[in-house]
Amino acid sequence: MSTGQSEDHLPISAAEAERLFAPFADSGVLTLAVSGGPDSMALMWLAARWRATRAGGPRLLAVTVDHGLRPESRREALMVKQLARQLGLTHRTLRWSGEKPAAGIPEAARIARYRLLARAAEQAGASHVVTAHTRDDQAETVLMRLLRGSGIAGLAAMAPVSRRDGLLLARPLLSLSKARLLATLRSAGIAFADDPTNRDPAFTRPRLRALMPTLAAEGADPRTLATLANRARRANAAIELMADGAERYLALLAAGRSSKRRGGEGEMFDPRAFAALPAEIRLRLLMRAIDRVGTEGPVELGKAEALLERLDRTLAGITDGGTAERGTLKQTLAGALVSLAKDAIRISPAPPRRRRGE
């Protein structure tokens, strides 16, 4: 067993907790997302222990979202409240009320959960919503993105800090294994809830979770998959930087021609300059423009790729002096109209759809 593997079963030390939460030392309030499961209970305990060692620091608000999907959920929320009280933390339970969808429950519950967490954080004046995502969660997310055919940005999976619903979402435990969180709870004598939904084969994530031991035996263990996500994130950041530069370059060209349309009218690219860019940069610039101008975004990657292929074929007819597809294109996507004539690629708001019978 390697050193890294043996460390995966050790409790998290006070020194490690200090490093994990150090980026939040100057925050006024932190909202901790605590469901009652082992990961989030470990998060709350670690955050409280870290806060207790500091003369100053953020106030910690533990928030439990009761989705009302299982009869045990109220009892689990009460368990979180009791531990939070023992740790000297403020606790709130928020309930997902209203009718639940017949299908797509995990995604609907996730959206509702983050909406409620964001609202609680905003009311408390919190700088971050802190979640207990682990390296194991990251590995599962990478696999899910692979199965969906995600691009580089998707394979980067979860970032340590990201923005959602106007707030910063922080994942300080993303580099740690779930086994270490369990070891921490055992060492501290802290109980936690066991949600059977996490093992329900009716849902994609639990099915992939059940496959992890087999994948690990072939070398695709959580550490390796998380490393893949980190490398994809680095590559994505580099490509985004290049796309920013290309976008500025095209804007300067358009300004020089005094023909760039602004505001609600849309955007314009010089066809030859656009065609000279690498394919991934062209794709990102196209998606950015569609998302800015369109009304039905964000645009789907696969549909944007198909549009770019058609645009490239049409551009070939212009840049090579030929007549491929007669050198013109007009297509709507995600509420935007993408058109190409000899002088410009234009992305503008799509006209309203006609109702049947009109």
Curated annotation (Swiss-Prot):
GO cellular component: cytoplasm
Gene3D superfamilies reported in the protein's UniProt record: HUPs
Localization, UniProt: Cytoplasm
Organism placement in taxonomy: Bacteria, Pseudomonadati, Pseudomonadota, Alphaproteobacteria, Hyphomicrobiales
Gene that this sequence comes from: tilS
Protein name per Swiss-Prot or TrEMBL: tRNA(Ile)-lysidine synthase
Main location: cytoplasm
Catalysed conversion reaction: cytidine(34) in tRNA(Ile2) + L-lysine + ATP = lysidine(34) in tRNA(Ile2) + AMP + diphosphate + H(+)
Any one Gene Ontology molecular-function term assigned to this protein's record: tRNA(Ile)-lysidine synthase activity
Binding site for ATP: S35, G36, G37, P38, D39, S40
EC annotation from Swiss-Prot or TrEMBL: 6.3.4.19
Family: Belongs to the tRNA(Ile)-lysidine synthase family.
InterPro entries found in the cross-reference section: Rossmann-like_a/b/a_fold, TilS/TtcA_N, tRNA_Ile_lys_synt, tRNA_Ile_lys_synt_N
UniProt keyword list: ATP-binding, Cytoplasm, Ligase, Nucleotide-binding, tRNA processing
Family matches, as NCBIfam families: lysidine_TilS_N (TIGR02432)
GO biological process: tRNA modification
Function: Ligates lysine onto the cytidine present at position 34 of the AUA codon-specific tRNA(Ile) that contains the anticodon CAU, in an ATP-dependent manner. Cytidine is converted to lysidine, thus changing the amino acid specificity of the tRNA from methionine to isoleucine.
Domain of life assignment: Bacteria
Entry note about domains: The N-terminal region contains the highly conserved SGGXDS motif, predicted to be a P-loop motif involved in ATP binding.
